[in-house]
Amino acid sequence: QYLAEVLHEEGYKVYGLIKGQRNPKAEMINTEFPFVELVEGDLQDLSSLIAGLEYTQPHEVYNLGAISFVALSFKQAELTANITGLGVLRLLEAIRLVGGEDNPVRFYQASSSEMFGKVRETPQTELTPLHPRSPYGSAKVFGHHTTVNYRESYGLYACSGILFNHESPRRGIEFVTRKVTNAVARIKLGLQDHVALGNLDAKRDWGFAGDYVRAMHLMLQQEEPDDFVVATGETHAVSEFVALA
């Protein structure tokens, strides 16, 4: 959503890929983001991606599609691999087949700090070894390396942003920041009296999603494609977040 708004502000014609005519998010997008034209497609179906690219003829493609909740990836590992990992390959292959010298497409892949997993150094950089510890992280590693492979093998302008946690009021309440803020609001209104959390000492690098999408856009405006870590450089404990809320 933030990315669509930034691109619209920059004067882009914005298309959004959506799976199925009856997708429950379609009405919300049409109402709140009328400048976005929805195009049907599926990261599990190469032919639909080719058709979508042929119709839209984009100059830039941003892939934020994923099964993005780490805990869910353990329960749906195959689906996570198929969408979050192989979906990147299908999209890059579609770009390779549809694009060309007459329409060079620039591609952004949303990689994740979950790829680092078992951390070997702090802070992590673009050169830190990857050691994912979840199906989600593993799928992101596949997508990340596939992006590099298509850049080096086919000369595509393809780059990855290795994003640390990016939060906003639009975040799903299954994520800890929104779980806390939602619970605090409900407690204030007398709708509940407590919130159950996991490890309060866990530390995260939390940034604002609205800032991070600007970094995504800037990455596709450079002369040469490359991969970049996108983070604040500061970590805070969950307990700090709870106290502030």
Indicate residue ranges for each PLM-predicted region.
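NAD(P)-dependent short-chain dehydrogenase/reductase
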Residues: V119-P123, R133, H145-Q221, G233-A245
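Conserved metal-phosphate-binding beta-hairpin within the catalytic cores
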Residues: V230
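N-terminal Rossmann-like NAD(P)+-binding domain of SDR-like oxidoreductases, especially those catalyzing
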Residues: Q1-H166, G210, L220, A243
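His-Asp-centered acyl/peptidyl-transfer active-site segments
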Residues: E224-D226
